[in-house]
Amino acid sequence: MKLILTADVDHLGAVGDTVEVKDGYGRNFLLPRGLAIVASRGAQKQADDIRRARETKAVRDLDHANEFKTAIEALGPVTLPVKTAGDSGKLFGSVTAGDVVAAIKKAGGPNLDKRIVRLPKAHIKALGTHPVAVHLHPEVDVEVPLEVVPQS
């Protein structure tokens, strides 16, 4: 059975791909769930339009990610003042991805989602400079030096 995917399906293809599947898989799984439509001339044209739109969006997303990367790199080291537990340099609590996003925004950077921030460990628990990776796009990553300093 020849189908055109209307959603990404693991181990099968992406939106707009024309795939050949067994009849039962197509009739009993893909079609009822709206994951695919039967391939026809009109459906093929629609799939081509979807594919073109997806490619345009991918290029736009990559350009947008590169703009964010340039803006973040222009910031230089980002300073984050935190409360310390004493003179030992240990923090009262820890620095999370949300704290990093807030520090980048406060430094004049773009508004980011905390889920794209990759800390060197689960949480930062000491003063000093820590490299923090920001995953903007599958092809674009940027490393931000984060200076954790005691709050005055």
From Swiss-Prot:
One of its GO terms (molecular function) is rRNA binding. GO terms for cellular component: ribonucleoprotein complex; ribosome. Keywords: Ribonucleoprotein, Ribosomal protein, RNA-binding, rRNA-binding. It comes from the Bacteria. The keyword Ribonucleoprotein applies. InterPro entries: Ribosomal_bL9 (IPR000244), Ribosomal_bL9/RNase_H1_N (IPR009027), Ribosomal_bL9_bac/chp (IPR020594), Ribosomal_bL9_C (IPR020069), Ribosomal_bL9_C_sf (IPR036791), Ribosomal_bL9_N (IPR020070), Ribosomal_bL9_N_sf (IPR036935). GO terms for biological process: translation. Coiled coil: none annotated. The keyword Ribonucleoprotein applies. Belongs to the bacterial ribosomal protein bL9 family. NCBIfam families: L9. Binds to the 23S rRNA. This is Large ribosomal subunit protein bL9. It comes from Mycolicibacterium paratuberculosis (strain ATCC BAA-968 / K-10).
